[in-house]
Amino acid sequence: MILRGHHGAARDSSAAGPVWVTKVDPGDGATGVFRDTPVLARLSHPADAASVHTGSFRVEECGGAEVPGVVLLSPDGRLLIWTATRLLAPGVEHLVTADGLKDHRGRQVVPHRSRFMPCALARDDLPG
């Protein structure tokens, strides 16, 4: 369903249809990412909290080693927040995978993969 308002057409995210990851930060192909940066994923529909865990939303180093971390869900159910429990490896490509998530209606979220590369710095390394 398309809604029309003062600012043009917009998608009605409550309508039936596919459920997908609309945005990930750091973005696909990002470089120079701080080693302590959380990974954020915005969903088109609220997630079923029971489907949100480190098996369904994870970060791995190139080569397949999973990075230990925790994943939280925002109160509105649309934002996944993954935080590493150690600093990310600098200069190593990291793969973000969302696979096995469901929305609050039980519909499968379309699997997502993206990549980013941390630099040698963490935010705490910066002065000030």
Give short role names for the model-derived ranges.
Residues 3-8, 13-128:
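Acidic, low-complexity Ser/Thr/Gly/Pro-rich repeat segments typical of extracellular/periplasmic
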